[in-house]
Structure formats: C-alpha cells, structure tokens
C-alpha cells in the first residue's frame, strides 16, 4: 500500500524562514505523488474547503497535486500539509482532517486546491463543505456533493449524482446513464450529446424549465439514452444539445 502525506512546506528549502518562503515554481511542483495505473481507478476526494479538479485523459498513471489556495496564508498551507493521499488496490483517496471546531459554512476557512489526473473512465466520488468540484474529460460514474459551491462534470461516460445546497450544477455532455441533479438554490444545466435520447423528470419550486432538445431520429436503446432527474427549489433548469452549449 502506497501512502503519503502531501506537505506543501516540502516544496521549499528548509533554511528559508516560513514568512519568506516563495510561491512554489513549476519545477518544484513536479514532486507530486505519481502512481502507475494502467486501468481506470476509483477516486474519492473529501475536503472541507477548496477546489477539487479531477481530469481524465488517455494515460497510464495517476498524478495528485495538493496546494494551499493561498500560499501566503498559514492556515491554507497547514491544511495542505495535513491532507493525506492514499492509493491501494486501484482506489485513490484524498482527505483533509475533519476539524469542525474551525470550520464554518460562511467562508473564511483554510482552503486548498486538489488536482488529480487519472485514466479515462475512472470513477469519481467527491465531497466539499465550501468550494467547487470539477470533473474534466471522460470520467466514469460520479457521485458529488457540495454544501455551498458549484459542481461541473464535462463529459461523463456513466451516471452522475450531484447535489449542492447552494450552487449551480452543469453537465457538459452526457451520452448515457442516469443524471440525478439537485440544488436548493441555483441553476441546473444539462447538455445531451446529439444522437442520444433523453427522458426528463424535472421539479422546480420557483424558476423555469427550458427544454431545448430537438427530435432524435430512430428508436434509441438504453446505451444511447440519458435519464435526467433534476430538482431545484429556487433556480432554472436548462436541458439542451451539447453542441448548443
């Protein structure tokens, strides 16, 4: 089992006083944990406050970067130092300590930036208290939740469950699977790949539903059907072909 704790301070020369430590250069940032992953993996990221980005592409390794959102803030640096990265049996976990004594949903929390590069088709589970979650590239099934912040999944290959109490949710281009999207305050936007059929079930308490999909030629099988369940208490829902996004 490979286990490593990302320490932002390790990127700097130990002789430099903390108050004078520079922002890490591109060369210094290359000392990031790398795992050999010839097949898609399962990614789980849990942060209290910050930005989480998982990028899927045609690659045979997984690279993890954890940085303070602001290298000049001691609290952000400490949060990055304490973030733990573990990889075993095709599963990657990135977690920050749950210190609810210093956490507040109103902002001002220590914040970090997590970036994970994975093989195409990898699954992604992510949670954040305050922040933003982005899934880029062709990811597998995604389960994402943010208390306050936006969620974006660009090109999912499978199903997506995304929930935020306050924020927007956007799916760039869905081809198949089930999309379960829910926000209390915010907009929901779904792009359907041209040629794929869609079955919609939307619930909006205060807002509007804009179905901009055109007809699809021929009967569509399950492999080319997207089932969308979208719910917003206060906000709009937009369903459209991805080419129109």
Report each predicted region and the residues it spans:
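Short, Lys/Arg-enriched N-terminal segments with co-localized hydrophobic residues
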Residues: 11-31
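Right-handed parallel beta-helix
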Residues: 33-36, 82-158, 223-245
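Short linear S-[DN]-x-LW-Φ motif typified by the pepsin-like aspartic protease active-site region
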Residues: 28-88, 117, 123, 237-245
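Extracellular beta-strand solenoids
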Residues: 54, 116-118, 135, 153, ...
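Surface loops and adjacent helix of pleckstrin homology
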Residues: 48, 57, 67, 97-99, ...
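Residues that act as N-cap/strand-start positions at coil-to-secondary-structure junctions
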Residues: 29, 39, 48, 77-80, ...
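Short, surface-exposed interaction patches in beta-rich subdomains
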Residues: 168-245
């Amino acid at each position: 089992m490979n286990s490593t704790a990302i320490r932002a301070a390790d990127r700097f020369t130990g002789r430099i006083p903390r108050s004078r430590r520079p922002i890490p250069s591109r060369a210094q940032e290359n000392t990031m944990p790398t795992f050999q992953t010839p097949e898609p993996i399962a990614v789980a990221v849990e942060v209290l406050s910050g930005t989480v980005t998982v990028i899927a592409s045609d690659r045979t390794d997984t690279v993890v970067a954890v940085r303070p959102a602001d290298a000049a803030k001691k609290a952000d640096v400490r949060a990055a130092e304490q973030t733990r990265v573990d990889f075993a049996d095709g599963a990657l976990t990135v977690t920050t300590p749950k210190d609810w004594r210093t956490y507040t949903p109103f902002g001002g929390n220590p914040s970090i930036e997590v970036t994970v590069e994975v093989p195409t088709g990898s699954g992604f589970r992510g949670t954040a208290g305050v922040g933003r979650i982005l899934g880029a590239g062709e990811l597998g099934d995604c389960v994402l939740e943010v208390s306050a912040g936006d969620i974006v999944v660009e090109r999912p290959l499978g199903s997506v469950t995304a929930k935020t109490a306050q924020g927007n949710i956007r799916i760039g281009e869905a081809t198949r699977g089930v999309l379960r999207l829910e926000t209390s305050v915010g907009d929901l936007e779904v792009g359907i790949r041209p040629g794929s059929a869609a079955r919609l079930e939307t619930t909006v308490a205060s807002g509007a539903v804009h179905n901009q999909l055109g007809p699809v030629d021929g009967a569509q099988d399950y492999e080319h059907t997207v089932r969308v369940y979208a719910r917003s208490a206060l906000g709009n829902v937009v369903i459209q072909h991805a080419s129109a996004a």
